[in-house]
């Protein structure tokens, strides 16, 4: 196997038999099954529910020859919306509980100052621009999903063929992004509200403001897979020819229709947002994968040989336009209504010439061949050894050379936006495993193995080399009016009108400006790999109790990471007695960033030790319990769909983000206890019911988003 360095899921689909069988099922949960009270504090709880309906049917079309199986599932989901609400009057307190926010429902005057109401903003946009920004509080969202699967099995003679089709569609609603990239929050949101302590937060989703429903987005997830397998027998040789095609399509959608992203400030902090999330317009991911594998196996004496050859082709398409519908930041509602120059502005536009969206795409192929021998050394001892060879093939990045960027001097070096790793770098990944029945009765079993596994590079990073080169699309923005290099536009509802604004003087598409944050790929970039070893002991204890003790150790090699060629080490500075910091500055006169996809060091690792007990009783009761202790050091786990977010966020940094360092693994739970009890009752001849109780206790390992997350005293900036 190949293509992963973490966990793998082995999915086996049902098939039809000579007997017609059908099933139907339903699962449900709703608002009332979710708690909303912590001690004496009651949380806002919007309506939500999820009900799953499913059915399957299988049987024979031709007895003993041709079988079918189909399954369908539909989820009726209603997702709770945001919990924040507006003030209904001047006497309402805000910010004290995180629920009531600063904006008012209707225009209100407090202390001689007038605050525009959310209802009044909606009314103005409807009358002026025929635009409905949607709701802003007290709403839920429908996010239905469905899954269908069909399978045919044909027993010809010694040859057997099966065909499988699956399609899933789902979507979920997300809050608007808190990021303002490429803007700088500290500049466009200078902050400060009424001078009150605890009320000076200035982010896009802070409680100083509220956003309309149009600022949310629906992330769709569509996955289609077609697979076929032909099993044949040629004398002593068994052969399996497999074909798989998969299509992953993940567009974003939003309410309200095309409109610019607009942030209205009040005293330097966000007051109201409407229009789409700034990263949603034109945002999509598409990955098409084609795999063909021919695999054989045969036995000779104690040897069971298996070998094969595989060809894989991937095409990744990424649509990403920061401020793709325009992004305006106004210092006040009055500035917006009177069409004054925006305090900050940004837009990404296509260079195709016909106004159509530019879609970055990249192709990647890989040829693999492998051989394995499973040797039955004795009746009690089995040894398996194998090796896999892989040859990656990268195509050229056509029409992706930005000559203006290539002229920038990065501390004595120049880089090209169309460079790629060298193709035809053959890699070998050996692996070995054993299974030893110590007594010959399967009472005590020792098993383990060790192997070197080649993974995959993050395609969304690689394809950004196309999207961020300013060849297919260009981005213009300014954080402050004094930095408006190409001018300040009036307000327009379409990008086409923004580009025609006489106040803007953007570079011609035929001579695109150097990007301010290009993606550069290391010519020597290698596939990430993991060396993984495991050792386990299984025992049947007195009382027919199953006991397992298992240890796992893995070490990372060549994990992909992102550094910034636009920054260089300046020197050390003592900012306080005994507190010496490394300082950095731009490496070029243009003050341009260049995000460099390269390999980190080889110091990341993971280990775990698990002990488990399980027992099944004759009367239908099953009990199990396990404890896992795990530990990991990583280079940041590659978090971030964008190279700039991967560089700045979730990085373990003491000496700057360009000095890749290890820190605690992001998703590893140091301690985890799992216990379960299941009881199955049979009745009325053909019926049975099962009741299960599951307990899980663990330390959260995620880098952010949970109050129980691991605390760290390693930061990415000065404290």
Tell me what each language-model feature is.
Residues 397-429, 433-599, 719:
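Solvent-exposed loop/turn elements at secondary-structure boundaries
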Residues 24-30, 70-74, 163-167, 241-247, ...:
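Transmembrane beta-barrel strands of outer-membrane/channel proteins
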Residues 65-66, 159-163, 236-239, 303-305, ...:
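Repeated loop/turn-to-beta-strand initiation elements of outer-membrane beta-barrel proteins
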Residues 1-8, 14-211, 218-224, 233-236, ...:
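Acidic, glycine-rich flexible loop segments
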Residues 394, 516, 526-533, 539-719:
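Short, solvent-exposed micro-motifs at the edges of structured domains
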Residues 5-7, 51-55, 146-150, 222-228, ...:
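Hydrophobic, lipid-facing positions within transmembrane beta-strands of outer-membrane proteins
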């Amino acid at each position: 196997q190949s293509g992963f360095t973490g966990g793998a899921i082995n999915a086996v689909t049902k098939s039809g038999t000579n007997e017609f069988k059908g099933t139907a099922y339903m699962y449900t949960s709703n608002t009332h099954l979710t708690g909303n009270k912590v001690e004496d504090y009651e949380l806002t709880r919007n309506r939500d529910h999820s009900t799953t309906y499913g059915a399957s049917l299988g049987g024979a079309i031709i007895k003993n020859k041709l079988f079918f199986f189909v399954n369908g599932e539909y989820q009726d989901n209603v997702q709770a919306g945001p919990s924040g609400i507006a003030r209904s009057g001047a006497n309402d307190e805000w910010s004290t509980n995180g629920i009531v926010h600063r904006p008012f429902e209707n225009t209100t005057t407090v202390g001689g100052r007038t605050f525009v109401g959310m209802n009044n903003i909606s009314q103005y946009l409807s009358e002026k621009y025929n635009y409905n920004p949607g709701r802003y509080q007290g709403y839920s969202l429908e996010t239905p999903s469905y899954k269908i699967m069909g399978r045919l099995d044909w027993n010809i003679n010694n040859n057997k063929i099966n065909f499988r089709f699956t399609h899933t569609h789902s979507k979920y609603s997300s809050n608007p992004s808190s990021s303002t990239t490429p803007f700088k929050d500290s500049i466009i949101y200078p902050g400060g509200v009424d001078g009150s302590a605890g009320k000076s937060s200035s982010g896009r989703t802070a409680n100083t403001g509220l956003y309309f429903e149009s600022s949310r987005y629906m992330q769709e997830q569509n996955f289609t897979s077609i697979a076929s397998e032909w099993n044949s027998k040629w004398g002593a040789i068994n052969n399996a020819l497999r074909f798989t095609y998969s299509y992953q399509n993940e567009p974003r959608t939003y309410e309200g229709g095309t409109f610019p992203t607009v942030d209205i400030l009040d005293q330097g902090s966000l007051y109201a947002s409407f229009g789409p999330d700034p990263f949603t317009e034109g945002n999509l991911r598409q990955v098409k994968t084609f795999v063909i594998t021919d695999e054989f196996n045969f036995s000779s004496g104690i040897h069971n040989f298996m070998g094969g050859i595989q060809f894989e082709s991937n095409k990744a398409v990424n649509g990403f336009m920061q401020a793709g519908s325009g992004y305006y930041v106004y210092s006040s509602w009055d500035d917006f209504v009177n069409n004054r120059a925006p305090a900050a502005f940004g837009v990404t536009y296509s260079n195709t010439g016909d106004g159509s969206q530019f879609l970055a795409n990249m192709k990647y192929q890989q040829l693999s061949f492998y051989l394995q021998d499973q040797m039955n050394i004795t009746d009690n001892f089995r040894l398996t050894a194998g090796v896999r060879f892989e040859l990656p093939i990268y195509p050229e990045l056509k029409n992706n050379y930005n000559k203006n960027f290539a002229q920038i001097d990065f501390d004595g070096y120049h880089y090209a936006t169309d460079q790629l790793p060298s193709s035809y770098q053959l890699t070998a990944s050996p692996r070995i495993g054993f299974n030893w029945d110590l007594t010959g009765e399967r009472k005590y079993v020792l098993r383990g193995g060790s192997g070197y596994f080649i993974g995959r590079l993050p395609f969304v990073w690689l394809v950004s080399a196309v999207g961020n080169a300013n060849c297919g699309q260009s981005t213009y923005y300014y954080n402050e009016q004094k930095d408006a290099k190409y001018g300040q536009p009036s307000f327009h509802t379409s990008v086409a009108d923004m580009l025609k604004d006489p106040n803007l003087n953007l570079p011609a598409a035929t001579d695109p400006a150097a990007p301010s944050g290009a993606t550069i790929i290391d010519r020597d970039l290698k596939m990430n790999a993991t060396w993984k070893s495991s050792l386990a002991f299984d025992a049947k204890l007195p009382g027919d109790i199953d006991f397992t003790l298992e240890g796992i150790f893995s070490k990372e090699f060549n994990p992909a990471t992102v550094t910034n060629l636009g920054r260089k080490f300046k020197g050390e500075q003592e900012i306080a007695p005994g507190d010496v910091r490394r300082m950095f500055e731009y490496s070029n006169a243009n003050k341009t960033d260049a995000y460099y996809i390269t390999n980190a060091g080889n110091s990341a690792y993971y280990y775990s030790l698990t002990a488990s007990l399980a027992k099944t009783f004759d009367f239908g009761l099953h009990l199990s319990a396990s404890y896992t202790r795990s530990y990991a050091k990583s280079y940041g786990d590659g978090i971030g769909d964008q190279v700039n977010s991967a560089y700045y966020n979730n990085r373990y940094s003491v000496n700057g983000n360009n000095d890749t360092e290890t820190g605690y693994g992001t998703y590893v739970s140091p301690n985890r206890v799992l216990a379960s009890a299941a009881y199955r009752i049979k009745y009325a001849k053909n019926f049975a019911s099962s009741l299960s109780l599951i307990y899980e206790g663990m330390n959260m390992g995620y880098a952010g988003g949970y109050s129980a997350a691991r605390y760290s005293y390693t930061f990415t900036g000065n404290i």
